[in-house]
C-alpha cells in the first residue's frame, strides 16, 4: 500500500512539473501580417535606424503590391505570393524613381536584398507580429523589418 501511494505521489509531482513548464513557441507570420508599413531595422547583419535611413517598405496585401522608400528614391513593385506555399515570397521587378542623392550605397543594398528574398518569418515570441525577417535562397537573413505605427509620407 505504501509503495502504491509513493508511486502515485511521484506520478503527480512529475505531471505537475511538466504542466508547469511552458515552452515558448515562436510566432508564425502569415501573408496578411505583412500588410502595412515596415521600417528596415537590419540589412545584411547591420542594425539600422529607419528614421535615419528613411528605408520603409509598405505592403498592400490585397493588391499584392509593394511600395515605400529605398532611402532616397521611392520604390514600387509587385509581391509574388501563393497561399499554397506558406512564407514563400518574392519581389520581382522592383522599380524606383531616379533622384540623385549623395550616398546611394544603402539604397542599392536594399534593392539588391529585395531582389534576393525568397521567404519570410516572424521574429520574436509574442503576438501580434511586430518584426519579420526576410531570407535569401541560402537561408541567409537579408532584412529584418519592424512594424511602424504611423504612415510615413513618401
Model-derived regions, located:
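Lipid interaction determinants
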Residues: 21-154
Amino acid at each position: 500500500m505504501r509503495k502504491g501511494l509513493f508511486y502515485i505521489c511521484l506520478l503527480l509531482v512529475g505531471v505537475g512539473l511538466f504542466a508547469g513548464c511552458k515552452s515558448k513557441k515562436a510566432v508564425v507570420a502569415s501573408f496578411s501580417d505583412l500588410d502595412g508599413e515596415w521600417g528596415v531595422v537590419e540589412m545584411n547583419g547591420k542594425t539600422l535606424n529607419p528614421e535615419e535611413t528613411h528605408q520603409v517598405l509598405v505592403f498592400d496585401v490585397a493588391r499584392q503590391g509593394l511600395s515605400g522608400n529605398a532611402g532616397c528614391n521611392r520604390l514600387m513593385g509587385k509581391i509574388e505570393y501563393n497561399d499554397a506555399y506558406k512564407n514563400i515570397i518574392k519581389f520581382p521587378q522592383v522599380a524606383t524613381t531616379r533622384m540623385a542623392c549623395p550616398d546611394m550605397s544603402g539604397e542599392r543594398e536594399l534593392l539588391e536584398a529585395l531582389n534576393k528574398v525568397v521567404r519570410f518569418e516572424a521574429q520574436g515570441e509574442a503576438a501580434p507580429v511586430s518584426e519579420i525577417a526576410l531570407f535569401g535562397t541560402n537561408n541567409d537573413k537579408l532584412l529584418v523589418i519592424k512594424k511602424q505605427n504611423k504612415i510615413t509620407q513618401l
